[in-house]
Structures are given as C-alpha cells and as structure tokens.
C-alpha cells in the first residue's frame, strides 16, 4: 500500500486487512484520566505494585515534603511528576520502589492563616488546635491534585511532620544531638523578621533591591596621642584642627548601637588635611571620597591599618546626648574591603555577624553588647533620641541628628540588594538574640575515647560521598556548608515542635537530666501531640525542683522538622516500608535519592545533611537530584503580579495531566523549565503523534494471539528482524537514561522512533504486507510478531511519563492474555534476540539512506506532474560496493521498501556513485493494492487485480523473504 491517506473503504469484494481497535484516536484525557485515577485507587494499585516486588531490592526516593498551605502550583507538579517517573522507572526495572508522600505542617505561614481567620491573641493551645485542623484540610486538597497528576504512592498513609509520632521522634532526635555535644545556647546575630517576630533560617531569606539612605559619618578623634604615633606626627599638629575617622554605611539605624570600628590590617590609611579638618580614609579611596564630600584635601601622612589597632574615637552622637558618651575602638578585620566607601567599617555587634565576631574576639561580653532594637523593629523606649521609633522611620531622623552634630559628611539614597523575609516580602535584619544553636565547629563528645570531627567537617565529607544530578550541585552545596554560620535551631513561634527544655530561672542552665526529661516529654507528645508540652505541669516531671525551673518557650526551626524525616519517618513512622537493613549495614544511608528544586541546597538537602551528620555521621541520602524553576516562554519567573502563572489544575482540566507529564519529561530539568500556551501546544502535538503510532500498532495487532501466532525470529522477514534489533538497541539507551535520571533524551528518542523509525519507515513499508497478504499468512504474522514485541517494549518505555496512556494501551494490548492487568506490576520487556543484529542494523541503515534519496527524486518527479502517488513510479538505482549488494539482496521485495511499483538495481559506473532514475509506470493500477503492474487483469475472473492480490485472495499467496 502507498502512503496515501484513504477514507475507510466501503465493503469490497476484494477486501484488505484493515483492522480496528478499542484504543481511540482521541485521548480525551481530561475525561478519561480521572477514571483511571479512581480505578487505581479502587484496586489499590500502589499496594499491588509493592506486592509484585516483594523481596526485591528496595529503592527509596524519600519525599521532600511540600508545605501544607494553599493549592499546588506548577512547581509542585514538576517536582511530583519527576519523582513519580523515577519511582515508576525503578519499579519497572524490578526494584521494590517505595514512595511515601509527605507534608511539612508546622511553621509561620499556617500561624499567619490562623491569625487572618481568627484574629491575634489566641491562647497557644487554641492556635495549635486550629493550625492542626487547617493543615489537615490543606493536605486533603493538595493530595487530590497530586493524585490527579497520575502520581502513585502510599496516599493512604502519608507522613506528616505534625503526626504525633513524628513530633515525638523529632524531640528524641534533638535529645540525641544534645547528648553528642552539638547544641549550645548563646547570644548571636540571627536573621530576624519583625513581621514573624522570630529568627529565620538561611533558606527563609531572599534578596531584593531596597532603597536606603547611604551615609558617611565621622567619628571624632579621641586619642590624638596614639594617632600621632601611628602617623608619625606631632600631637600638636593633630590637635591643631578637628579630625574624624570616616565610615560609610547603608544602615543608619545601626549608628546608635555602634561599639567599634574596623580596618584591614594590611590596607594603607591616609591622614587627609581638608578645610573641614583631618580625615582618616583608606588611601586608595581618598580621591573618590573627597569628591563625594565636596572637599579639597591633601594627604599629610599614611600608615597601615595594623598601626591603628585599638585606638579609640568618640561616638558621633556623643555631643547630642550623654547616653552616647562612649569610645569606639578600632579592631582589625580581614573582611574590610576598599571597593566602596571609606575603607573603614563601623561595627554594631548586635546587628552584624562579622561585627559580632570581631567584638567577641576582642573580649566583649554578651552583657556589654548594646541591642536596643526590639523584636518588632522598634527601638526600646530607653534609647536616647530615638526611643519608640521603628528603625526604618528612625533612619531620616538619625541623619538629621548626625548633621546637627557636625559629624555627617554625606547622605544620599542608595539602591542595593537586601535581605527580605520570603513569606512577608519585608526587609529583615541581623539581630543578636539569645538562641539555641547547632555548632558547626564545636568539638562533639568523644566516642569510644576518640575525637569526633566537627559538624562542618562531617557534612563536607558526606558531600564527597554523595552523587549529584546535575553534577554542579556538589560544589554549590559544598560552598554553602563551608561558609555557613552555626545553625539557629530555635524559633519564637507557637505552631511548632517545642524545644522542650527546663531552664534554671536564675542561671539559665539546662536541667541536668535534660536527655531523660526530653524522652519523658516525647512519650507524652506521642500520645497527645505537641499540645502536651503546653498542658504539662513541670511538677509532674520535676517534683520539688519545679519552682527552680521554667519551661523553654522556643520551638524548633521547621527545617529541623523536615530535616529529620530520615530519622522520624524512614527509621520511625514508616520504618516497615522505607527501612532497609541491608542499606543500613552497608553505609547507613537509607534513601537512594532526595529530589527537589535548586533552592533546596540551602533548604531540605542542607538541613537533612546537617541532622544526619550529627545523628549518624553521614548523609541520609546516596544521591541528590536538583531541578530548576518554572519560567514562562520568555524566561521570566512565574509571578501573579506579572500575570504569567500557569495552573496545573487548569492544564489537567483542559488538556490532560498527561500533557503536564510529557512536558516535564521532555524538558531538561537541570535548567529552568519554560512553559507557555505555545509550548503546551507543541507538547500536545507530540502526544498526538505518539498516540497515533500506538493506535496503528494496536489496530494491527487486534487479530493477533501470541500464544497461537508466535514465530521464532529466524522465521521473520529480514526487515522485521531489523526493526526488533533497532528496538533492542534503543531500549538499551532508554534504560541507561532512566538509570541516570535522564528523561528528556528518552522522550526525544521515543518521538524519533515513532516518527522516523516506525512511522517514517518500518510501518510505512509494512502497511502493504499487513493489509494485502492473506490474513493468516506467515508474512503477515511475522510482521505482527515484530509489532507485538515493539509495542510491548515501547509501552514500558512510556509508562513512567505517559502513565495514563500506557495503562490505557496496555488494557487493549494485554486483554485476554496472560499478561498482568496493569503495566505497572510488569517489568521492562525482554526483546527476542536477533542473530547478527549489528550487521542487520548497518545494512538497513544504508538501505534507509538509499530510500531517502529515492524519496527525494520521487518528490521532484511528482512536483513536475509526471506521477501522483509513489506507486505510479518505477525506479532504477545504480549503486556500487556494499550498497549495491544490499539492494540486490532484497530482490523483488526492494519495491516494497521504496514504495514503488517496480525497482531495479544495476552497477554504477563508479563504486561510490548512487544514481536514481524515476519513470512513470505504463501499467494498469491494481484495484486492491494500488500497485501498477503488468499482470493486472491476467485472471479474467478478476480483471482489476494484479497477480499478487489474486494469489493472496484466491490462491496460495505471495512469498516474501525480506520486506
């Protein structure tokens, strides 16, 4: 048959084998997919898959829990579909691939929702009860959407960080790391959000541009004798006029808390004589800064930063209020730069990490640190001049007072990247507060008399033992761990797991039986949830000591919640499903894979690594996979304000979840994932091509029974053996990609296979044999044998990403056979072995190149009007060498490969030549097969049939060997 498209023929006295299938051409995905979801739920498909893999090696993809707040967005869909594809691909490879979905349930966003719905000031217990109910409802909504995407997992038994057992085990994990010596309490600057009223984790901070007042402030000379010595000048010369050391800052609100100044020990500093007085600036900044100050000046002396160490200066507000009558010493700091500003940094230890470290290193006690900013961002009422003002409102007033003091040299608006709360989108600050920390560089308790590496050392070593997909994630996580500060474990919140400590009222010391008491609290939490801590009377546990202690009111960082799920879930609540003793014995890393967005290098990947390093001394995972963020077709970040967000629910309802899955699978997740209406239209077209190929395969297998019609590969036609060999080669590539968590190459190769290898060649050639040879002929059954094997292999390749379609096709393909009732309990298909497969592949590759040249020449003749269909043509090919031999080996079957009515081969003048001559056939057209043949009408009883069709219908049937 030709490649012409024909309407379904009316009944003919010369019928062809045109079969139909119950697999429809139109996917009608929005309607059919929910039916599949319900069917999978009803038959408990995930349980059936687990039962089918019982005893097999486990593969654990541990779910990074989404937050139980709001509807899922396209980023959630990407994440869950990627996980689902991996779990299904591993399951089809024969592994017991386990997927327990989870949810992150505690934290500020839910507290905010409760506050919005019920107002502020609720008792803690009431907040917790309402938060638990709210999270439960959100989880139900999100679960429906995740299942709608075709994601299989233990949806009936997900893990929730708010489950009582998980909350209790989290407390036990805290107890363990305390016993190991990682946890301490201290005053440190931490990320602080005024709107949250709490410390923030590093992962809860984002950076946005902010406009601030940039100021250059002079600290008046106080110890001129020491300055004179440093600059090798006389005291009289320095006392002749006023002088200042000048700092530059973009946080005027920190000036009232200044306690020191920092210079770089190796930088050269200049004493500059100006009409206003002496200024001390970094030498390389003098020219630029004088321009800014609109001053002329001359350098009269220079010295090194080291020579200025410990020299003190007056606070710039000292003249305005005696409350600032203090001196600020110079401390040396390697972090001081001369890229911008004056080369001198003002230090407010309560509001800067480096400031704090520098001042502490020089002997400043916690008690001495000045910290007037309260948790709501307002200065304490006792602060001179600015008490009661918010720090942002105080900025312009501070500038006014500095100007009045005569110590302001410049002020202007300055745009810079600044820290913001990821929830409230409001600016945050560093603020020194008393918090509980996990120390990155503290020395843990010795084990068996041996020193234990620090947390930082253990975590960095763990990174080296972890596989990263893509590989750049390794360096990214390494840099974050190498440079991070101590982990602030405590939060000042209500809806969170309590740091259930008893603290001495006078000394602040922990109760000496803290580890034992934590276990007692954990048992109560296991029965009643974190609410048990709120209702607990200290006397119940402390007896007569109760009056000496108070309950700690801090909660654990929510990143500790999700970061300990390797302990609370894999080794805890879902141990029966997820725990693998052999993996524990091997190296203790129980999760084969953690998979999340690239932001989780500073989030879940990070916190999980730190907690596992403290608990076990190794990472909880063997591999980390990172995917990019979704952007629109122009590469812009998804934003409601821009109006470019895409709803997975809308796509599923309009196009089908299968389109989302195919889009995810076909996109390189290692970078940004672009999505738009235009991109989705292309995905739909791609889906249709794959579906049409499947429909053709299933249609032509509708009268095939493998138990009756199977033939050994040696009895197939040569082109059938080639097609199966090609399928086998592709399958090896597909499975290799799946092993490496690569999906877009699989989709690309499947599309090429469908459009070029099958639709553009093999199936195109096969149509004549399938349609025109006798229904039960060996030639036709051989073709169906090949299609049977190709279809079964292809359905398994598709199943991880086109899950609904593969399952739908499987029901048609496997109906009434001994196959499993779902494709997901089967495994990748083992294709029959084809003898001399490599030789066949090479030979047919050459033949396809010849066919491409013939098609090109046929098209040229068609354009000229000499022929219509390619079957109106007869072709002569002149070739040499192996190509000539390959063409000649096909004998009369060559015309079927070329889709022409006749084909002859002759030697070319030169061995490497390939010459194609096309002529229009002068013969009559067979009514049935449409070939133009000399023997049409040779049987007067059937004057419109060629001899081949006459034989196939009424005689012994034609014989074919090759195609």
UniProtKB/Swiss-Prot annotation:
Zn(2+) binds at residues 926, 929, 946, 949. CDD domains: Anticodon_Ia_Ile_BEm (cd07960), IleRS_core (cd00818). GO terms for cellular component: cytosol. Its EC number is 6.1.1.5. It comes from the Bacteria. L-isoleucyl-5'-AMP binds at residue 596. Its main location: cytoplasm. Pfam families: Anticodon_1, tRNA-synt_1, zf-FPG_IleRS. Its cofactor is Zn(2+). A motif ('HIGH' region) lies at residues 66-76. It is an enzyme of class 6 (ligase). Binds 1 zinc ion per subunit. ATP binds at residue 640. GO terms for molecular function: aminoacyl-tRNA deacylase activity; ATP binding; isoleucine-tRNA ligase activity; tRNA binding; zinc ion binding. Catalyzes the attachment of isoleucine to tRNA(Ile). As IleRS can inadvertently accommodate and process structurally similar amino acids such as valine, to avoid such errors it has two additional distinct tRNA(Ile)-dependent editing activities. One activity is designated as 'pretransfer' editing and involves the hydrolysis of activated Val-AMP. The other activity is designated 'posttransfer' editing and involves deacylation of mischarged Val-tRNA(Ile). Monomer. PANTHER family: ISOLEUCINE--TRNA LIGASE, MITOCHONDRIAL (PTHR42765:SF1), SOLEUCYL-TRNA SYNTHETASE (PTHR42765). IleRS has two distinct active sites: one for aminoacylation and one for editing. The misactivated valine is translocated from the active site to the editing site, which sterically excludes the correctly activated isoleucine. The single editing site contains two valyl binding pockets, one specific for each substrate (Val-AMP or Val-tRNA(Ile)). This is Isoleucine--tRNA ligase.
